[in-house]
Amino acid sequence: MPHLTHFDTAGQAHMVDVGDKAVTHRVAVATGLIHMLPTTFALVRDGTAKKGDVLGIARIAAIQGAKRTSDLIPLCHPLALTKVAVDFELDEADRTVRCTVRAETHGQTGVEMEALTAVQVGLLTIYDMCKAVDRGMVIGDVRLMEKRGGKSGEWVAQ
């Protein structure tokens, strides 16, 4: 039976020791979306929101979120990220904006949490910048899509 690595035998939380792990190229891709009203979607799509370039600011916020992950997630190791790429895909029919983040490092632990945090921060920034016109936006479907590197190798969502 698998065990939770962030707890010792007494059930106390601790930061996992990654000191003996090999330095490898680590990659993680995460995604999520935000659903909004048609009028809100048009503001985002057209770049006419009162607060400015929603997607441009959300992109910077997502990158910053990846960089600050270890400050937000208590047992997450600080990483020297080598790449954070943020992509937004607009779906007019569903009135959604999908945020996809690819994070990379060369290190001893994976970048899944950085990619997931970046997606959430990017989507929260869209919410923040548009909440004056649409408080009913829904953030959802946030998930890890793939990870590569390290002892556990490659994993791709089904």
Swiss-Prot record:
For this entry, list what GO says about its biological process: Mo-molybdopterin cofactor biosynthetic process
Which InterPro entries does the UniProt record give? Answer: MoaC (IPR023045), MoaC_bact/euk (IPR047594), MoaC_sf (IPR036522), MoCo_biosynth_MoaA/MoaC (IPR050105), Mopterin_CF_biosynth-C_dom (IPR002820)
The source's superkingdom equals Bacteria
Q: Which residues form the active site?
A: D128
As for family, the record states: Belongs to the MoaC family.
Q: Which HAMAP family does this entry report, sorted A to Z?
A: MoaC_B (MF_01224_B)
Say which species the protein is native to: Ralstonia nicotianae (strain ATCC BAA-1114 / GMI1000) (Ralstonia solanacearum)
Protein name in UniProt: Cyclic pyranopterin monophosphate synthase
Q: What is its EC number?
A: 4.6.1.17
Its annotated function is as follows: Catalyzes the conversion of (8S)-3',8-cyclo-7,8-dihydroguanosine 5'-triphosphate to cyclic pyranopterin monophosphate (cPMP).
